Amino acid sequence: MGASVTTGLQMAAARPCIPACQRLLGSRAALPSFGRALSTQTGFASCRKTASAGPFVSLNHKRFAVRAMSAQGLPIDLRGKRAFIAGVADDNGYGWAIAKALAAAGAEILVGTWVPALNIFETSLRRGKFDESRKLPDGSLMEITKVYPLDAVFDSPEDVPDDVKANKRYAGSSNWTVKEVAETVKNDFGTIDILVHSLANGPEVKNSLLETSRKGYLAAVSASSYSFISLLQHFLPIMNPGGATISLTYIASERTIPGYGGGMSSAKAALESDTRVLAYEAGRKGKIRVNTISAGPLGSRAAKAIGFIEKMIEYSYVNAPLQKELLADEVGNTAAFLASPLASAITGSTIYVDNGLNTMGLALDSPTLST
């Protein structure tokens, strides 16, 4: 069972952080949300250049990291709740941060890890590699009750092609399709209360949409959006009424982000649309709330496959209303709120956690503003 915080979670401002132009974020996550401010021409300018962009940008700015801490106040109390987080494969991404926040609020944590990454993840846990990042606000370590092998691209054993079955990266693992994992969780624990989808993959993400193959496009949609539908299909029967589901999306669902291709923008748009439809269906069928978080850029291992994540981190810092580093914990805290009774009337919503970058319609680092 994850450690409980009897006084709940409360937000507090921590010490100023180093500007992104001096230190780029190096934590890990699944494919991130990047922002929606419009860039022009070359698009990404350094902080030095942007400081001379006229009256739009202040020369003297500080940023503060907002972290959760245990203190007296309105509590996020998830004691007695059980969460399944799909898509945790390391200790620095959004999925991990969400797991920590839920654990800090008292929830029991189960995770689903991509089969080829399972051995490394479990070995790292056993050897204490993640102990520092497992620390909760009360000083205890987050406990993961069980790690399940999972490949959410496949709904049932009948869907798994022979080449995957024969792949040595899947050797030694079993019962890892969505249907099998849901059945195993039911056999192990009976029910869950919180379902988190932290999964995304676009094999052709570096390709423009015009250069994306049908196979690559459909693979992106399958792994990044339909996987959520499949998870909810199979886990809904074992979710307690009043439970919640949370997924992670990206502003490319609404705005053009050159470089985020391969059908990933379409997949995120589908995920947000599905969030609204599933909010109705799961709400009526199981009294389950369905929301998605549109998070800002995070320098994850997966995101680095896109090729320009560090520039997007800097771009976000320069152009967002709040000029501060976006922490994975801030996304985790939002997820804990959405999973809690405090958000009991919120469903079908896309919640932006990006320092406000989604509100911007002008890129302050545009070369045109410096002339």
Curated annotation (Swiss-Prot):
It catalyses: a 2,3-saturated acyl-[ACP] + NAD(+) = a (2E)-enoyl-[ACP] + NADH + H(+). Keywords: Chloroplast, Fatty acid biosynthesis, Fatty acid metabolism, Lipid biosynthesis, Lipid metabolism, NAD, Oxidoreductase, Plastid, Transit peptide. The active site is at Y250, Y260. Residues 1-67 form a transit peptide. Pathway: Lipid metabolism; fatty acid biosynthesis. One of its GO terms (biological process) is fatty acid biosynthetic process. Pfam families: adh_short_C2. GO terms for molecular function: enoyl-[acyl-carrier-protein] reductase (NADH) activity. One of its GO terms (cellular component) is chloroplast. Belongs to the short-chain dehydrogenases/reductases (SDR) family. FabI subfamily. PANTHER family: ENOYL-[ACYL-CARRIER-PROTEIN] REDUCTASE, ENOYL-[ACYL-CARRIER-PROTEIN] REDUCTASE [NADH] 2, CHLOROPLASTIC. This is Enoyl-[acyl-carrier-protein] reductase [NADH] 2, chloroplastic.
